[in-house]
Amino acid sequence: MRSALFICAFLACLALTSSRAANAKASDPPNVPNIGFVLYTKSYAPGTLNARWMYGNAYSGPGIATGGQTIGFAGRYHVRYFYDSGEFSDEYDLVIEKNKDSYKASWIAKGKVAAIGVGMEVENGLAIGWRRVAD
């Protein structure tokens, strides 16, 4: 009787541990480097940019930045990103500043800079490499 109870308790603990481990793997893949890339292209809507982004080798999807200037890429935007599945990912206030032939970008959430990047214009767009800022 004791051994049957012990086996049931052991299997219950094993099942609980396995499900927690699976959830951790699904939400945060191991070895994801803190580096991303985004390509912004002009939308037909004035002051709007379409985005195609990726983070490390684990996440990617589309996005849309609104509220910017009608000419060029520099300006202040509100950007929303989505996963390839269509599920919402993140949203930020995005500041893009031009300096000669290069650009500096800052993604701001809740009044704090969450990510920074640098980029340059490419054919039909603005390419930016970025990383999350450590707390």
Regions found by a protein language model. Name each.
Residues I7-A15:
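Bacterial N-terminal signal peptides
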Residues M1-A4:
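Positively charged n-region of N-terminal signal peptides that target proteins for export
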Residues A22-D135:
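Central antiparallel beta-sheet cores of small beta-barrel/beta-sandwich binding domains
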